[in-house]
UniProtKB/Swiss-Prot annotation:
Pfam families cross-referenced by the UniProt entry: AsnRS_N (PF20917), tRNA-synt_2 (PF00152), tRNA_anti-codon (PF01336)
GO cellular component, as recorded: cytoplasm
Transmembrane segments: none
An annotated Gene Ontology molecular function: ATP binding
Name this polypeptide is given: Asparagine--tRNA ligase, cytoplasmic
Residue ranges with Polar residues bias: 12-23
Provenance organism: Debaryomyces hansenii (strain ATCC 36239 / CBS 767 / BCRC 21394 / JCM 1990 / NBRC 0083 / IGC 2968)
Keywords, ordered alphabetically: Aminoacyl-tRNA synthetase, ATP-binding, Cytoplasm, Ligase, Nucleotide-binding, Protein biosynthesis
CDD domains for the chain: AsnRS_cyto_like_N, AsxRS_core
C-alpha cells in the first residue's frame, strides 16, 4: 500500500503536488481523493513525545477525510458533466453558426418595388410593400421567428422575420440600437394581437446599416432606467432615445408650434433680439458675465427691453429665445439656460394683459392636446391632465396673504405673512393646490418686483403685475404693465443703482412717443413639466444646463 503525507501548515491541495514527504498535501480529504487506497500520514505531535513528525491518521480523522474525499469526487464528476455540457453546447452553437453561414439573404427581384416611407405614415400604406429605415428599439429572437420593433423618430413598427431571415447569422448578431433598412409588406394585426399602430411589417429583405456594440459596450449597459440621474445626464445623447424623453421633446416641438400659431392669430410679429447684452433686467447677481472685446457684457436674462423697442416700429411682438440665469440653484424648477417665450403688447390696460394671458394659455394647451401626435403623448405621459378653462381666478397679493395666514401657512421665517413678504414657492404651491384652479395672482408690492413695473394708480405701494399659478405645478408665467412715464422710469433705474447711460436706448422709448404697454415671459420647460407631468424641468430641456452641468 502506498502512503501519502499531509501537512496542514506547509502542504497544498493541488494536482501539481505529489503527496510525498517533500511535497505533502494540505488536507487528508484531498489526499484520499487523489489516492483512494493510500495510507495517510499526517504531520502532528507524536504520541508520548513533545516532538512533531509524521504519524498515521486517527480513525475519526480518517472517517471525516473519507467523507470529504467523497464530496470532492462528486464535485469533480459534476464539474466534468458541466464541462461536457458546455463543450456540447459550444459544438452545437458552432454547428448552428456554420449552418447559418450557409444561409444568405437575397432580395427577391420579382417582388413589387418597395415604397420608401417614414413610420408616421404606416396607416396610409397598409397592404403596400415598403422600405423603412431606423434603429432597433426592441429585439426578440426565438426558434424560427424574429421580432424587431423599429424606430425612426417619427414612429414605431413591429417587424416580423421568418424562415431564413430569422435563421441567418446576421439576424442572430443584431443588437439594440443597430440601424437597419427593412423591406416588406405592412399588414393589419390579426385579432387578439397587439403592436404599435395595430400593424406589423412582414419582412422579405433587410440590410444592416450600422451594427451597435454588444457585451460591455451594449446600449442597455450604457443607459439603465434606474441609474443615477447624473449618469443618465452624462449619457443624455443616448437617453434621449428612450420613449419618455423623446415623447417630451415631441410635445415640446408641438408646444412651440402652438405658441407661434396663437401669436399669428393675435397679429403678433416674431423678432430675434440679441443674446449678448450690456444691460440687466432681473438683477445683477444672476448675470453671466463675459469679456466682449475688452468691454463687460452679459448673456441675456430676458429680451423684454428689446421687445419694448419694437412696439413703435412693428406693433405687438414676441420672441422665442434662450435666456440665461446664473442662479446657483439646485431646485427642480430652475435651469441656467432655458427657452424663454416673451411678448410685449402696446396700448393696452392691465385687464387686457390678464385676459390675453388667459387666452394664450387656454388656446395653446387646446392646440397641443388636439394635435394628432402630441395629444396621445400627453395622455400617455400625464393621463390625469385637465386643460384649463377660462376665466381664471383672480386673486390680489394682499388677499393671498390673508388666505395663507387663515390656513396657518407661515412665511420663510416661520411667522405670519405681512405686506412686503415674498411668497415662497412652497407656500404658493400649497395655496394653489388647495384652491385647485388656475390663479392670476396680481398686484405685488413694488419692493419685491422689478424696477420697470407700472405702479397701480389706486395704490402706489403695489404694481400692475401678475403671476399665473397652476395646480400641481405652481407658477408657469409672470408679467406686468411697464412703467411708461420717463421720469418715473429714470428714478427707478437710479434707485436700483444701475448705470442710466447704459439704458439710454430704453428710456428713449418714453421720450419719443410713450404709450401704456405690458408683457410677460413663459418658461418653455415649466409649461412642458406641467403638460407632461415631469418632476423636474431638466427632463424638458434637450441638453439641460444648471449648476455644475454643462456637458455633453
Amino acid at each position: 500500500m502506498s502512503q501519502v503525507y499531509v501537512n496542514e501548515k506547509t502542504g497544498a491541495d493541488s494536482t501539481d503536488v505529489s503527496g510525498s514527504e517533500q511535497q505533502p498535501f494540505q488536507t487528508p480529504a484531498f489526499a484520499l481523493f487523489k489516492n483512494e487506497d493510500a495510507k495517510i500520514l499526517v504531520y502532528k505531535q507524536l504520541e508520548d513525545s513533545e516532538e512533531f513528525g509524521y504519524g498515521e491518521i486517527s480513525a475519526s480523522a480518517l472517517k471525516k477525510a473519507k467523507k470529504g474525499a467523497e464530496g470532492l469526487k462528486k464535485k469533480q464528476e459534476k464539474q466534468a458533466k458541466l464541462q461536457e455540457e458546455q463543450r456540447k453546447h459550444q459544438d452545437d452553437a458552432a454547428k448552428k453558426f456554420a449552418e447559418m453561414d450557409l444561409i444568405s439573404i437575397k432580395e427577391d427581384e420579382s417582388l413589387p418595388q418597395a415604397k420608401k416611407i417614414k413610420l408616421r405614415t404606416v396607416q396610409d400604406n397598409i397592404g403596400t410593400r415598403v422600405v423603412v429605415q431606423g434603429w432597433i428599439h426592441r429585439l426578440r429572437l426565438q426558434k424560427g421567428l424574429g421580432f424587431i420593433t423599429l424606430r425612426d423618430g417619427t414612429g414605431f413598427i413591429q417587424c416580423i422575420l421568418t424562415g431564413d431571415l430569422a435563421k441567418c447569422k446576421t439576424t442572430h448578431e443584431l443588437t439594440l440600437e443597430s440601424t437597419v433598412t427593412i423591406k416588406g409588406v405592412i399588414n393589419k394585426l390579426p385579432e387578439g394581437k397587439s403592436a404599435p399602430g395595430g400593424v406589423e411589417l412582414k419582412v422579405d429583405y433587410y440590410e444592416v446599416v450600422g451594427l451597435a456594440p454588444s457585451g460591455e459596450e451594449a446600449f442597455s449597459n450604457k443607459v439603465q432606467e434606474n441609474a443615477d440621474p447624473s449618469l443618465l445626464l452624462d449619457q443624455r445623447h443616448l437617453a434621449l432615445r428612450g420613449e419618455s424623453l423623446s415623447a417630451v421633446m415631441k410635445v415640446r416641438s408641438t408646444l412651440l408650434q402652438a405658441i407661434r400659431r396663437f401669436f399669428a392669430e393675435e397679429g403678433l410679429l416674431e423678432v430675434t433680439p440679441p443674446c449678448m447684452v450690456q444691460t440687466q433686467v432681473e438683477g445683477g447677481s444672476t448675470l453671466f458675465k463675459m469679456d466682449y472685446y475688452g468691454e463687460e457684457a452679459y448673456l441675456t436674462q430676458s429680451s423684454q427691453l428689446y421687445l419694448e423697442t419694437c412696439l413703435p416700429a412693428l406693433g405687438d411682438v414676441f420672441c422665442v429665445q434662450e435666456s440665461f440665469r446664473a442662479e446657483k440653484s439646485h431646485t427642480r424648477r430652475h435651469l441656467s439656460e432655458y427657452t424663454h417665450i416673451e411678448s410685449e403688447l402696446g396700448f393696452i390696460e392691465f385687464d387686457d394683459l390678464l385676459t390675453h394671458l388667459e387666452r394664450l394659455i387656454t388656446y395653446v394647451v387646446k392646440y397641443v392636446v388636439e394635435d394628432p401626435v402630441a395629444g396621445p403623448l400627453i395622455k400617455q405621459l400625464n393621463p390625469n391632465f385637465v386643460p384649463p378653462q377660462m376665466p381664471f381666478k383672480r386673486m390680489e397679493y394682499i388677499h393671498a396673504l390673508d388666505w395663507l395666514n387663515e390656513h396657518g401657512i407661515p412665511n420663510e421665517d416661520g411667522e405670519k405673512f405681512k405686506f412686503g413678504d415674498d411668497i415662497a414657492e412652497a407656500a404658493e404651491r400649497k395655496m394653489t393646490d388647495t384652491i385647485g384652479v388656475p390663479i392670476l395672482l396680481i398686484r405685488f408690492p413694488v419692493e419685491i418686483k422689478s424696477f420697470y413695473m407700472q405702479k397701480c394708480a389706486d395704490d402706489p405701494r403695489v404694481t400692475e403685475s401678475v403671476d399665473v399659478l397652476m395646480p400641481t405645478v405652481g407658477e408657469i408665467t409672470g408679467g406686468s404693465m411697464r412703467t411708461y412715464d420717463n421720469d418715473e422710469l429714470v428714478a427707478a433705474i437710479k434707485r436700483e443703482g444701475l448705470d442710466l447711460d447704459s439704458y439710454y436706448w430704453f428710456t428713449d422709448q418714453r421720450k419719443y412717443g410713450t404709450c401704456p404697454h405690458g408683457g410677460y415671459g413663459l418658461g418653455t420647460e415649466r409649461i412642458l413639466a406641467w403638460l407632461c407631468d415631469r418632476f423636474t424641468v431638466r427632463d424638458c430641456s434637450l441638453y439641460p444646463r444648471f449648476t455644475g452641468r454643462c456637458k455633453p
